[in-house]
Amino acid sequence: KIDLIDMFEDDKWKSCSVLEVACYKGYTTSILSKLFERVWAVESNKSFLESAKKYNEKNTNIRYIRENVYAGRKWKRFPIADVVFIDCNHDYKSVTSDLEQSIEHLNDGGFIVMDDYGLFWQLKDAVHDFIKKMDGEITIHKYIGEPEGSTARKGKVMNDWEGIILKYK
């Protein structure tokens, strides 16, 4: 997560907002809460959401939303943000949906951060197909995290960088 800190620790981000889709137990949420003025943390699993709240109980700039982003609803309940951080399902269809929904909730000039980019080929394919489809409105800003060849959780080897940051317009 050091790359997130490097990218967003500048004072200009202190007044900005981030939408974190799939906050799990709140570890990344904690980092984001120190970088941004407002954090909206989305999680479908009630137990994980409660863990995230407990882990971040001293961080008062986090709002939690319990929502299954794949339950057929669009992200209508979610606010517009300067950054959207996604660590959801990793299959092609889900990633494509996440990216399409992200730009509906992203300010121009904002960023989409995709976690686990180098672990799942379907995620990587969906990202690159989406970039092509957006015809210049989405560009690769930078790759982040562990590099190709690194060993990740459960011994899985990265086939590319751990994460990717996309710039919108």
Name every feature range the model reports, one short phrase each.
Residues K1-K169:
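S-adenosylmethionine/decaboxylated-SAM
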